[in-house]
Amino acid sequence: MSTSFENKATNRGIITFTISQDEIKPALDQAFNKVKKDLNVPGFRKGHMPRTVFNQKFGEEALYENALNLVLPKAYEAAVAELGLDVVAQPKIDVVSMEKGQDWKLTAEVVTKPEVKLGDYKDLSVEVDASKEVSDEEVDAKVERERNNLAELTVKDGEAAQGDTVVIDFVGSVDGVEFDGGKGDNFSLELGSGQFIPGFEEQLVGSKAGQTVDVNVTFPEDYQAEDLAGKDAKFVTTIHEVKTKEVPALDDELAKDIDDEVETLDELKAKYRKELESAKEIAFDDAVEGAAIELAVANAEIVELPEEMVHDEVHRAMNEFMGNMQRQGISPEMYFQLTGTTEEDLHKQYQADADKRVKTNLVIEAIAAAEGFEATDEEIEKEITDLASEYNMEADQVRGLLSADMLKHDIAMKKAVDVITSSATVK
């Protein structure tokens, strides 16, 4: 194979490469065997036309496109490897010449990975808005949340107050005309929960069972239903019942009801403190890691980030998100309908972070290369075992989904992140 590379601009160039007759001939044979199955020519049984007759009737050139599709991927990859290029986007392939009996000549317009000039990435000093300390108030708040989960609703006489639940019928209208989604029967609404649009719940404070209240509100300007956004509306609301929470006493019996592994309230609080400390330690470490990586990226210089890399990252993130939705039984159409958004909105959302994610990956990859990080066979096997355990899969299933190169890359990236974070200190 003959290959050459011509720089056209920063991170852009043209690869010129050839495909030899040794590669072309077997590809032509494969192409002929594929197309002859569908050939129905007088004088021959379907699929049994000799190659010589095919060449006379259609010309060998009729096989070139199919043959090229067979040999191109491998030939292109070989050219990239021979030139030592790190290509980051799909190439634009052009045929220069495909003459019978001669090597085929092609060009590939490519985008290459930008140069990363690393700055400081070790012994960084960072600030984080996180703490490992757990206060008594945080422990008490967790107990109180669990206590409220065990609360029972009982019907009460008198006026509804914040925190009470009202059972209501409501009919909404704009300019006297009812609108879709503005009607409900026997709906349980906790006042102060923020379930309804601003201003609605507050107007039911002080109401009593049996009353009908006109609730006047204005839909927010950014309301998901565009035909209602910014408009004044009236909800004729009938209160059937007012219910209040009856929370259990804060004692040892409550503790046992919450967690059957404890005997006293003090034991429950001690258990919650350990859980909160563990969660806070993880959150603190994550915050340090995020801040250290962000500083390492800021200290580095990336020579002209190709827009194709950002574009590919946006689509990768969108496809991953929509794939997760579909695994939960939510189609893209259903998601956009439920959220009142469009594919363009989702694209903009991911576009905002794509540039940062691409730069971060490039810098971490550059650190891994600078440190000479590689994955051992033992580390690869451990990664496979860990992933299999995490996702409840067989190890062979993981091997089938992830190539060895992907696993090696991920392990090297983790080592680079560890270099950044393990030496970082908090101001």
Curated annotation (Swiss-Prot):
The top of its lineage is: Bacteria, Bacillati, Bacillota, Bacilli, Lactobacillales
One Pfam annotation reads Trigger_C
Q: Which organism is it from?
A: Streptococcus agalactiae serotype V (strain ATCC BAA-611 / 2603 V/R)
Anything noted about its domains? Consists of 3 domains; the N-terminus binds the ribosome, the middle domain has PPIase activity, while the C-terminus has intrinsic chaperone activity on its own.
Q: Which residues form the PPIase FKBP-type domain?
A: 163-248
Role of this protein? Involved in protein export. Acts as a chaperone by maintaining the newly synthesized protein in an open conformation. Functions as a peptidyl-prolyl cis-trans isomerase.
Q: Transmembrane residues, as ranges?
A: none
Recorded GO molecular functions are:
peptidyl-prolyl cis-trans isomerase activity; protein folding chaperone; ribosome binding
Q: Name one GO biological process term.
A: 'de novo' cotranslational protein folding
* Predominant place of localization: cytoplasm
EC nos: 5.2.1.8
Q: Which family does it belong to?
A: Belongs to the FKBP-type PPIase family. Tig subfamily.
Q: Which UniProt keywords apply?
A: Cell cycle, Cell division, Chaperone, Cytoplasm, Isomerase, Rotamase
Where is the protein situated, by its record's location annotation?
A: Cytoplasm
Instruction: Please verify whether the record's keywords include Chaperone.
Output: yes
Q: What is this protein called?
A: Trigger factor
Catalysis: reaction(s): [protein]-peptidylproline (omega=180) = [protein]-peptidylproline (omega=0)
GO cellular component: a single term: cytoplasm
